[in-house]
Amino acid sequence: MKEELMTEVMQHMLSYLDNAQMKQLRQVMEQALCRYDVTELEMKPEEDDSNNLIARFIAAKRIEGCSEKTLKYYQTTIDALVVSIGKSVRHIHTEDLRTYLTEYQSKKQSSRVTIDNIRRILSSFFSWLEDEDYIIKSPVRRIHKVKAASNIKETFSDEDLEKMRDNSENLRDLAMIDMLASTGMRVGEMVLLNRDDINFAERECVVFGKGEKERIVYFDARAKLHLQEYLDSRTDDNPALFVTLRTPHERIKIGGIEYRLRKMGKQLNIPKVHPHKFRRTLATMAIDKGMPIEQLQRLLGHQRIDTTLQYAMVKQSNVKMAHKKYIG
C-alpha cells in the first residue's frame, strides 16, 4: 500500500519536478512513511457526501427561519453548482467557483445582480461548512461582492395610480390596488391576509413578512372605503381577504394578482405594472416627504437598512431643491 501511495504522489508531481527532484521526493517519502502503517479507507461516494451536506445545510437554514421559497432557491443554486463542477463540495476550490460563475454569466447572459445573488448563497453554504468543520476554509472568501450598475428603477406617478383606480374592472381589483399602494406590503403578505386581520377602526393590519416576522402596516382612508365596499359585495364565506372572482371563490394567489396588474398595465399603456412597483413607489414617496429612513425600514419590514435605501429613490427635483437650500 505504501508503494502505491508513493507512486500516485510521484505521478502527480511529474510535470512539476525534474528527475533529481523526483528521486529526492521518493527518498523523503520512504523515510517519512517507514514509521507508519498505511491502509486504504473506503470512501463514501462523493455525490452522496455532497447531497448529505447540502441537506444538513438546508435543515440548518430551516431552523433559522428561512422561508420554503428561500430554501428552494438555496437548494437549486447549490445543486446546479455541484452538477456543473462535478466535485464533492469538500474539494471545490476558489478557481472552480470563479470559472463556474464566469461560465454561468456567459451562457445565461445573467445580470451582475443575479451573479452576486448566487455568490451570496454559495458564501452562506461554504461558510456553514467551515463553521461546522466540514472544510478548513471557505473557497468563497476570496470572491468579492460583484459590483452592479446602480440603475434607477421606475415608480408609479400619481397619474398612473389614478388611471389604474379609474379603470379597475371590479371592486376587488380596486381594493387590491389601494392596499398595495397605501401599505407598501409585499404581494406574498397580502395574499395571506384574512378578513379578520383587518382593523378598520385603526386602519391597520398585521402581516407576516419574510422569516415569518410579524409587523403592522397601515392603509389610508381611500383604501379603507374601497376595501369595505369590496367585502360588503362578497357572497362567499371564505375567510381570505381577497378571493378569485369565479366560484368557488378561493383565496387568490400571487400569480393571479400579477396577471391582473400586468393586463391592466397593457390596457392603459403603463410600463412594468407589477406588485413590487407599488412597494417601491411608496418607499420613494415616503422619503420625498421626509419620513425618517428608520421608520420606513420598519414599515417595509426590512432587516437591514441598506435594503431600504435600495428601495427608496429620491427624485432628482428634490435633490435640486435641497442643493439650492443648503448650498446655494
State where each predicted segment sits.
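N-terminal helical hairpins
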Residues: 1-45
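DNA/chromatin major-groove-contacting recognition/catalytic segments
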Residues: 28-32, 217-218, 313-328
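N-terminal core-binding DNA-recognition domain of tyrosine recombinases/integrases
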Residues: 34-44, 51, 55-152
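Catalytic-site neighborhood detector that most strongly recognizes the C-terminal catalytic loop/helix
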Residues: 43-44, 155, 210-211, 300, ...
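Basic, Lys/Arg- and aromatic-enriched nucleic-acid-binding interface segment
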Residues: 135, 147-151, 158-187, 211-213
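C-terminal catalytic core of tyrosine-transesterase DNA break-rejoin enzymes
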Residues: 178, 182, 279-302
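Short, charged phosphate-coordinating catalytic segments
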Residues: 180-202
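C-terminal catalytic core of Y-nucleophile DNA break-rejoin enzymes
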Residues: 209-229, 240-260
